Amino acid sequence: MTTVRTRIAPSPTGDPHVGTAYIALFNYCFAKQHGGEFILRIEDTDQLRSTRESEQQIFDALRWLGIEWSEGPDVGGPHGPYRQSERGDIYQKYAQQLVELGHAFPCFCTAEELDEMRAEQQAKGETPRYDGRALLLSKEEVQRRLDAGEPHVIRMKVPTEGVCVVPDMLRGEVEIPWDRMDMQVLMKTDGLPTYFLANVVDDHLMGITHVLRGEEWLPSAPKLILLYEYFGWDKPQLCYMPLLRNPDKSKLSKRKNPTSVTFYERMGFMPEAMLNYLGRMGWSMPDEREKFSLQEMVDHFDLSRVSLGGPIFDIEKLSWLNGQWLRELPVEEFASRLQTWALNPEYMMKIAPHVQGRVETFSQVAPLAGFFFAGGVTPDVKLFEHKKLSPDQVRQVMQLILWKLESLRQWEKERIMGSIQAVVEHLELKLRDAMPLMFAAITGQANSVSVTDAMEILGPDLTRFRLRQALDLLGGVSKKENKEWEKLLGAIA
């Protein structure tokens, strides 16, 4: 009997997302329920955005939740390497195999040619897609351009008529017309694979038997299925999980809800409660109980109990469930966990240098630096009253700074200050106009330790959360303002 093997394959391009944890949990439970194996693979072919720091955050977040893997970049295994950036020769081999079999072809079109092609198609009311012009080149022309070292990509051929039947473990057979599929790029000009080729090759070579992924990938499933057929490989069973939603039913996004697992750890949520809540996203226990452990979920896991309705990720409900877990802890464990969360030596050593020179007694530390040990803060709205800026301008400054910080890839004091400075300069203001607003939003006080030092220590998740809280306190941002200010954001260096 074939051993069930599932995997999670996140991209290390940002904070570890609760959506990644959600899909990892269901893959883990499915594998363990069937006595199988769960592995971790890192999809880091986006060399511009991928970082080892983000990769480590993924490891830490999943382990904090209690999800372990039997194979992966940090633990090794018989099917490595487990980072796609280290498997380049493997992808080159299989891309060339597809070309030799006549299922893929070199494409020499420049970015300008592709833009012009799409513009012409859109002008005609057509769906933009590659028109196959490289297929008209003779073999001699193709070889000449390859020998000359001309930059090119490798594209897959796709049918233009009929439908692809996608077997989904939740929905049954889903028919998707082939004319919706583009001639997907498989290998980029830099020699690195795109998601589609790397995904299929890795899943096959790593013996993955079942793939549980988000339903946003369902429309592109025909490309994956076609690649399995081109290679002559058995495809894994496919399951497209419902997406997590905001309370307003929109797709879960960090602009409306904190989406980083790290945020919930920093806020003092219990990992058991977080896993419990993610487990209830579109799934339920046979007896409908709300509180259950990871092992209990594994023991009773059945995909037939997954609901296709978009599960709502609601922080208030998560907080309620966390309270149930918290209050059932023995008091000794409660105290121990509290100490680990708030007073661990590593965190205290980040704070101490900024506080020590500002106090005369230990009793003065809490009033000065208590905000370091809180989730949110509750500043007095009067702290946002400004001599120079109107209330609307105050909200605009804070929203633009928040957006700039959301795009910050390296969370360092100098870069944080650079983001604030960029907004201030574009609005023709001074730093002294913006910094009191930052003090109020981040610390809840008129002054404290350096606010940029505080933001660096608190981290991106809590910093952005507090800025959102402050904006809500001031009345939020209307749709009209959001649209206008986003245009302004695009002009800020």
From Swiss-Prot:
Enzyme class, UniProt record, top EC level: ligase
Record motif 'KMSKS' region, residues: 251-255
Family annotation (CDD domains): GluRS_core
Motif segment ('HIGH' region): 10-20
Assigned EC number: 6.1.1.17
GO molecular function: ATP binding; glutamate-tRNA ligase activity; tRNA binding; zinc ion binding
List of residues binding ATP: K254
GO cellular component: cytosol
Annotated GO biological process: glutamyl-tRNA aminoacylation
Purpose of the protein: Catalyzes the attachment of glutamate to tRNA(Glu) in a two-step reaction: glutamate is first activated by ATP to form Glu-AMP and then transferred to the acceptor end of tRNA(Glu).
Subunit organization: Monomer.
Family according to the record: Belongs to the class-I aminoacyl-tRNA synthetase family. Glutamate--tRNA ligase type 1 subfamily.
Protein's name according to its UniProt entry: Glutamate--tRNA ligase
